[in-house]
Swiss-Prot record:
Catalyzes the intramolecular cyclization of bicyclic chalcones into tricyclic (S)-flavanones. Responsible for the isomerization of 4,2',4',6'-tetrahydroxychalcone (also termed chalcone) into naringenin. Its EC number is 5.5.1.6. It comes from Fragaria ananassa. It is an enzyme of class 5 (isomerase). This is Chalcone--flavanone isomerase 1. Disulfide bonds: none annotated. Pathway: Secondary metabolite biosynthesis; flavonoid biosynthesis. InterPro entries: CFI, Chalcone_isomerase, Chalcone_isomerase_3-sand, Chalcone_isomerase_bundle_sf, Chalcone_isomerase_sf. The record marks 106 as: Important for catalytic activity. PANTHER family: CHALCONE--FLAVANONE ISOMERASE 1-RELATED, CHALCONE--FLAVONONE ISOMERASE 1-RELATED. Part of the biosynthetic pathway for all classes of flavonoids, a large class of secondary plant metabolites, many of which are brightly colored. The gene is CHI1. It comes from the Eukaryota.
Length: 237
């Protein structure tokens, strides 16, 4: 896979072109980044800066259907972002504070959003209720000053590794692992899905992946599966 990936600076925060997240032995590339904020009395107030990283094999997997699509087409496609969220590759999301936040504030808001959506679609079960309880417990005693980060590593097998960083460094090991596929996927979808909390991150991911998919070398077999005839990624700082 021929990738030219650069870092992004946004909201005063810097996201490097590649990271090795907690809970994974792989190095991921920066798919995109954006801020989360809202209009308050006529001013756009930024709360967090969010970076979305993907495992290298995301590009050939997505190229089968989406290569050649414009950034605008990808930005507006619900199906494209569902494929990112549910695809057979790892994802890593870094949520860095611009304004201070408590763990309780963060976990309760995420939990409320997830449960409301699950109940709407009739997919909220005892397993999800227990996963939400654990999710809230992990954050209970945490505080996040500006520059601190919440880290989510999402495995396609359904595990969600949660980590924290107060010094800008990415730890090798997470603070907790929750085994619930629905929660794992919902955390990312709540950010880049439609409607997600960061339209800016969604647009950034679509724009960068549109270019990476154009550059990608991939072979599609007759069964529609990808044969990776790819080159090593070229990651530019």
């Amino acid at each position: 896979m021929a990738q030219s990936v650069t870092g992004i600076q946004i909201g005063g925060m810097s996201f490097p072109p590649s990271v090795k997240p907690p809970g994974s032995g792989n190095t991921f590339f920066l798919g995109g980044a954006g801020v989360r904020g809202m209009e308050i009395q006529g001013n756009f107030v930024k709360f967090t800066a969010i970076g979305v990283y993907l495992e290298d094999k995301a590009v050939p997997a997505l190229a089968v259907k989406w290569k050649g699509k414009t950034a605008e087409e990808l930005t507006e496609s619900v199906e494209f972002f569902r494929e990112i969220v549910t695809g057979p590759f790892e994802k890593f999301t870094q949520v860095t504070m611009i304004l201070p936040l408590t763990g309780q504030q963060y976990s309760e808001k995420v939990s409320e959003n997830c449960v409301a959506i699950w109940k709407k679609f009739g997919i909220y079960t005892d397993a999800e209720a227990k996963a939400i309880e654990k999710f809230i417990e992990v954050f209970k005693d945490q505080t996040f000053p500006p520059g601190a980060s919440i880290l989510f590593t999402q495995s396609p097998d359904g595990s969600l590794t949660i980590g924290f960083s107060k010094d800008g460094c990415i730890p090798e090991v997470g603070n907790a692992v929750i085994e619930n596929k629905l929660l794992s996927e919902s955390v990312l979808e709540s950010i880049i899905g439609k409607p997600g909390v960061s339209p800016e991150a969604r647009k950034s991911v679509a724009t960068r992946l549109s270019e990476l998919l154009k550059e990608s070398d991939h072979c599609v077999a007759g069964n529609g599966k990808v044969d990776e005839c790819t080159k090593e990624a070229e990651v530019k700082a």
